Amino acid sequence: MTSKENQRADLLLLLFSVFATASANSVVFASMSELQEQYKYADSALGLIAGTGFAMGLLVQLFVAPLADRGHGKKLIQFGLGLAALGSIIFALGDSLLVFILGRGIVGASIGLTFPAVRALAAHLDTSRSAERLGAVAGMEIGGFVSGPLIGSLIIGPFGLDTTFLLFGALAVIALFIISPRKFPELASTSESQRLSFDLMRIRSVRVALILTLAVTFPTGMFDALWDRFLDDLGGNNAMTGLTFAVYGLPFILFSARAGKLIDKRSPIAVVLWLIIPISLLTISYGVIKQPWVILGVGLFEGILQATMMPAALSAIAKAAPLGRASAAQGLSGAVNVFGQMVAAFIAPTIYGAYGAFVTFFAVAIGIAAIAGMAGIMHLRNLKTAR
């Protein structure tokens, strides 16, 4: 194999690992109504199941992801896939709230192990094409997250919850066996690689990149918490909800890598700052539009913009990371993103219930613009200081 062929093979295996991990994590969202009907759980119990996965992903990204910078990248991915499979099996065999929370927590931890290591390794395969590689990773992450609920909703009915979770657990096992014989390039390691992620906050360029990724990703928490209810209030149904997720995710799968290729020739921070403007306006439009089919078209357009903005944000993190801290930086970014999504998911339903759709989406749009604006000001100060 030539060097390029090796890099391509490495990337494909990393992408498969990400897809298996993401889909194992997201399939639970297709099972929530089934769990509630079967076990008569309150809404708070469902929130506890879902929230445990987010919390575990956050903690693992902060404290375990830096191990990839010490030569353990492949092991973290393997362990992550193993946890995705184990958690899925526990969920399939469970029959109590405590067991479901345990299974969800284990599956959630798999993201904290797999995602930062894959992102760091993908960017490291060819640093001159890091945004292109990270775009491909972002596309596969979204593809996995969308596929989990879509496929799960199709097979839960005829085959049941147990079979559904076992199938996604089996996919993680297949990915584990496929990547295990492969030798991936190791990440650069220095004496700084022994440190935890937190100390990266002292670096100005890292702070800018973190704030930018927060602006890009925190609205996801609002959409996760509200989207199904929002469309239902407009007269949509479950099929429409699934279709909007599919339409939104399709541009990531098709265009993220190509967008990343263009971003490699530009400033990723500038790309994010420019795209924040139309994204904020589109977010406001959701609160104005009353037709689900029109929202479907807006979602497609937003998906195209986000498929460009996400690789740029990930590339900004990769470029800001010091030598030997690639996975730690990606883990810190992931933890910040999850925290922002958790806050948005907690607050948005309250605003929606009290003030309605327009105020909710307008508030989120203002939040996106304000956070990105803060990052832009900090970036300009960094440029002036560098001169």
Q: Model-derived features: where do they sit?
A:
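Central cavity-lining transmembrane alpha-helices of secondary-active solute carriers
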Residues: G51-V64, A246-F255
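Helix-to-loop junctions at the C-terminal end of transmembrane segments
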Residues: V60-H72, F255-S267, Y352
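Cytoplasmic helix-loop-helix junction between adjacent transmembrane helices
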Residues: G103-E141
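Structural signature of the two symmetry-related core transmembrane helices
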Residues: K75-I89, A270-I284
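Helix-loop boundary and gating motifs at the non-cytosolic
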Residues: N6-F54, R207, T217-L234
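Juxtamembrane intracellular "pre-TM" segments in multi-pass secondary transporters
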Residues: M1-R8, K183-L210
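A late C-terminal transmembrane helix in Major Facilitator Superfamily
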Residues: G324-A354
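Paired small-residue
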Residues: L98-I106, W293-F301
